């Protein structure tokens, strides 16, 4: 989905807005205005579907991936989506069921093992880097992670070791 209308864009360009919302991305736009107003989401069809749709989130307390879904509650489903999209530092953590979560890519960038364990024999993985690319290991940025997430040492560990 490409949004060309400036008033419906989800990237915060105004420094004041970034500071106030503590986010580079307007997550309220994406998870409140888009599904209810701008690009209406058919929750009834989604909830009635027999297909499973797990979203990967990273538990900030444990630093581990969790695979969540909701088939009844719109707000909880959108909270799971928001958490799954909340890039550390760029977006705030999201609380679900009393736990804080961020983007699932921190703990499980490509959840192929989960997919295989849940019975999916065929998987499509779309690479967004050149063939052979490997993320460099290192602790670059760890000071920022420690400062931002000092209450969550397991999340810091997951962020620093993400390339492994």
Residue map of PLM features:
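Detector for methionine-enriched segments
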Residues: 1, 27-29, 87, 93
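Non-catalytic peripheral regions of patatin-like phospholipases
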Residues: 3-41, 48-50, 58-74, 105-164
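Short linear motifs in intrinsically disordered
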Residues: 41-49, 81-86
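Short, structured loop/turn "capping" segments at alpha-beta junctions
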Residues: 45, 88-92, 124-125
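Short, proline-enriched alpha-helix->beta-strand connector loops that line the catalytic pocket
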Residues: 49-53, 96
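Short beta-strand scaffold segments in enzyme catalytic cores
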Residues: 53-58, 92
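ATP/pyrophosphate-binding catalytic subdomain of soluble kinases
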Residues: 79-114
